Amino acid sequence: MHLLPHSLRSLAASSAALLAAAFFLPACSSKTTGSSSSEDLLSFVDPFIGTGEHGHTFPGATRPNAMVQFSPDTHLIGWDASSGYHESDSVIYAFSLTHLSGTGIGDLGDVAILPYSGADTLRPIAQFDKTEEAASPGCYSVRLKNFGIQTELTSTDRVGLLRATYADSTDRKLLLDLGHILQPNWGHKVVGNDFRLVNDSTIVGTYYTKGWAEHHQMSYILRLSTPADSIALYRDGERQRLSAGFAVERDTADLKLHLYLPKGSAPYLVKVGLSAVSPEGAERNMQAELPDWDFEAVRTESRRIWADLLGKIRIETSDTAVLKNFYTALYHSHIAPFNYQDVDGSFRGMDKAIHKNPRPEEGHYTVFSIWDTYRALHPLLTIIDPDQALRYGKSLVSDYDEGTILPRWPLASNYTGCMPAYHSVSILADLVAKGLATSEDLRHWTEAAQRSSIYRADLAEKFAGTRELDLITRHPYYKER
């Protein structure tokens, strides 16, 4: 599940994706200028590296440690669907707002939308060619060839922005698939939906799923750049036309909303704000980060942010393959953990309650593959970004404060119980050894380490009845003292 090696391991397997990079479309291109600026380092990042074989990365738009990872879902079934995308695919089921990168298990895929045209079908599926697909840090684009739609994605930390350019003569439609899930054959499923049609350009809701994260929910607000002409809901395949004010609560049916958009030649934009707290939180996040519709401004700012981060390390070599491997790996290593907190400091804790960070500028993070990253990523950050290294450590301790133990693999306010050992303590000990912790931190963290050494079977639901749980509960070291 380690993020860095996949960029090396999957290079040969991703040759088709690398070939596609030569056909980058202008909005998502990343060309070398010949200068030594930080901006120029972006040309060495290839988001398609790792999307083949079992690298389990995705090519979509994101910012460092952002809540949003806006990316196409081309694969839904099995291990190849861990990130939602696989290099071997030629269809797109939807563009969803959250993804895991480089992990051995999949989840998320929250809030799935798809521009389409032509005949109505319950679940339209887009087709694409690799030569018409492009990605660079902060931007992804693809032509949906069976619909004749050029689709581009970019994002802020908590808001995804889609720009769709439909053919002049085509009907303009948009699917919001509230039944979308990755790896349903692994038992992952949508367990409920709240949503409300505020008006003909705004939908708010909360999406509840059961997957690797046993109890996951993501709230959202979806806004259209121009009001829809009409909106229809398919509930378990039965169609009904909606009007403003329509709402459902914890609906367990398969829900798909089809939005029929006005014709026109200008690009159509859709933005989706996220919050793990509430739809109101999603709206606040959108208002704070993307109150307007300036796609190019968002993309440009994303590139600047990534360029600044990549510029923290410079290597000297004439071998462009080494540069591409290195800077793509550095890019991948800053996708997760991601900030699970709203702009006002609110976040959903491991106890599922809502908490408020007294220092919202620091963030609260989730998606820690700790058994991989404790020995490389976290020590690296103490050198190139010690403030961020400390924020990660404090997030792990916050998980302890809310959930009573330090996590092994925290995922969206869930203890997954994944992977053995005790690596949160290694991360905290490294912060102490490098002088990044206060004396109060040391006292608090020592308490967390001691109390977390006692195995909590009730916080690892998926391991009930397994050999691992049986062994641990019989071992005298883990028994309550």
Could you say what each language-model-derived stretch is?
Residues M1, P5, D89-I92:
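Intrinsically disordered, low-complexity regions
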